[in-house]
Amino acid sequence: MTELSRIRNFSIVAHIDHGKSTLADRLIQETNTVSARDMKEQLLDAMDIERERGITIKANTVRIDYTADDGQDYVLNLIDTPGHVDFAYEVSRSMRAVEGSLLVVDSTQGVEAQTLANVYQAIDADHEIVPVLNKIDLPASDCDRVAEQIEDVIGIDASGAIRVSAKTGQGIHETLEAIVHHLPAPKGTRDAPLKAMLVDSWYDAYLGVIVLVRIIDGTLRKGERIKMMSNGTVHHVDRIGVFRPAMQPVDELGPGEIGFLTASIKQVRDTRVGDTITHEKKGAETALPGFKPSQPVVFCGLFPVDSAEFEDLRDAIEKLALNDASFSYEMETSAALGFGFRCGFLGLLHLEVIRDRIEREYDIELITTAPSVIYHVYMRDGTMRELHNPADMPDLTHVDHLEEPRIKATILVPDDYLGDVLKLCQDRRGIQMDLTYAGSRAMVVYDLPLNEVVFDFYDRLKSVTKGYASFDYQMIGYRQDNLVKMQVLVNDEPVDALSTMVHRDRAEARGRAMCEKLKDLIPRHMFKIPIQAAIGGKVIARETLSALRKDVTAKCYGGDATRKRKLLDKQKAGKKKMRQFGKVDIPQEAFISALKMDG
């Protein structure tokens, strides 16, 4: 049991690639928390995909013992948070579990959009913030300019910013001293009823669900019965401990401490992130503020390329859902793609990570249908329905109006590319809310429809700015707009997997582009195939794929013209009949590329 005055809980805030996980590695190394033999790069990023993409997805934690220059022994608890916008809720609750943050900024790059988003969350959580300028060993490093930028853009004093190189280890000791002397100790009462915040949870095949907790008040011991305050479920605590980063059992956790508990919990869904844990008897009366269950934002269909792998896909998705409470799924069937699942995600990176994990860890090839968002469909009878899949759109005669989700996008971009970025946002039906300058960079704030962003906005933004722009967004609610469902018909048959929701002004251009793309991708058949884009009963774009034909008159030498005519008419009748009964095979690549179009 550590005295409160000797505990420091902190997180590291940074944009992707600014060196957050490397700094965490150095802090662990400097304090000999892990033996030199067990040390490896990005120690806290356990998933392969985290290491490979160089991003942190789950919040990870480590307890570091440190003897400061004043001779006192301190316990430092670091929570390494994700930096990406999709995992913003993981960030916000990790922030509430600690009292201070190290703001890591790459001294060659400066402040980026996700740095801003996460710093504002830290400020909202009343954190003390210590700025750290990283990568000072690089020749392009410019600490004075970046320190000035931190003061201009974020508005915190950066005159005493610590200059470090996480790669070489320079400045790490100063960072540890700053954590001890500048960050506040946690507050809490040992004798009060137990209040613990559930920071994260994940599934372990042997122990069941492991729950990461921050004790606010009271104490937690092995063998006690605990209650989750959001759903009232009761569990018996099997073991408690701390991470150094390996699990180490302890007898009790007291106020201000961060550790884990296991209680034979079967599913991650029973442990909701941000929930309050208390004792079953004589528990706390009120829960901690700020709990909200995470809601999926982007939906798409996942189908196996080989339909025999459907059961394997089901197993894979069920196992991933055990570990990820923000990932939802339900079965769906598609006439074109067979059996699969309709899945909900927090955002596009979350979608990519899950898809990559299924393909890599379970070795299943997938087709992903076009990502779509949740629309609100207001019916004539006054009811409101949520529309997850454009193929389920009700008949327009019963619909009063549609509303789509909007986001507030913050884009940081060098001046030279500002025009291109503004044009891209206008093209995506954006409404400009703000434009400010900080040094040679502009900060643009736009109100954009989420539907226009989920497709390929991020890729387009990176390409028009040569990769220099950074982008962050948050949901701001729903607004009515003139939206229609566009269907694609191949040989007069609607293809459900290609249905999308588009704005009426855009429908024609989008439909034409899709038809042209399909015309190139579908192989020619023995009969003529019309490819059409339609809204309701009205066709707005059409391409015709011409038939392969055999030269039936080749055998006729001279002779009577009626003989040739007869053969040609016979062929024509055959083609007509074939078109009525013929099935068009649409190859898998056609789906994938038609959905990837730049619209």
Swiss-Prot record:
Role summary: Required for accurate and efficient protein synthesis under certain stress conditions. May act as a fidelity factor of the translation reaction, by catalyzing a one-codon backward translocation of tRNAs on improperly translocated ribosomes. Back-translocation proceeds from a post-translocation (POST) complex to a pre-translocation (PRE) complex, thus giving elongation factor G a second chance to translocate the tRNAs correctly. Binds to ribosomes in a GTP-dependent manner.
Segments forming domain tr-type G: 5-187
Main localization category: membrane
CDD domains (alphabetical): EF4_II (cd03699), EF4_III (cd16260), LepA (cd01890), lepA_C (cd03709)
Compartment list: Cell inner membrane
Membrane topology annotation: Peripheral membrane protein
Any one Gene Ontology BP term: positive regulation of translation
InterPro entries xrefs: EF-4 (IPR006297), EFG_III/V (IPR035647), EFG_V-like (IPR000640), EFTu-like_2 (IPR004161), G_TR_CS (IPR031157), LepA_C_sf (IPR038363), LepA_CTD (IPR013842), LepA_IV (IPR035654)
Protein name: Elongation factor 4
Alphabetically ordered keywords of this record: Cell inner membrane, Cell membrane, GTP-binding, Hydrolase, Membrane, Nucleotide-binding, Protein biosynthesis
The family this protein is said to belong to: Belongs to the TRAFAC class translation factor GTPase superfamily. Classic translation factor GTPase family. LepA subfamily.
GO CC, any one term: plasma membrane
NCBIfam families, sorted: lepA, small_GTP
Residues holding GTP: D17, H18, G19, K20, S21, T22, N134, K135, I136, D137
Substrates-to-products reaction catalysed: GTP + H2O = GDP + phosphate + H(+)
Enzyme Commission number(s) of this protein: 3.6.5.n1
Broadest EC class assigned to this enzyme: hydrolase
GO molecular function, one term: guanosine tetraphosphate binding
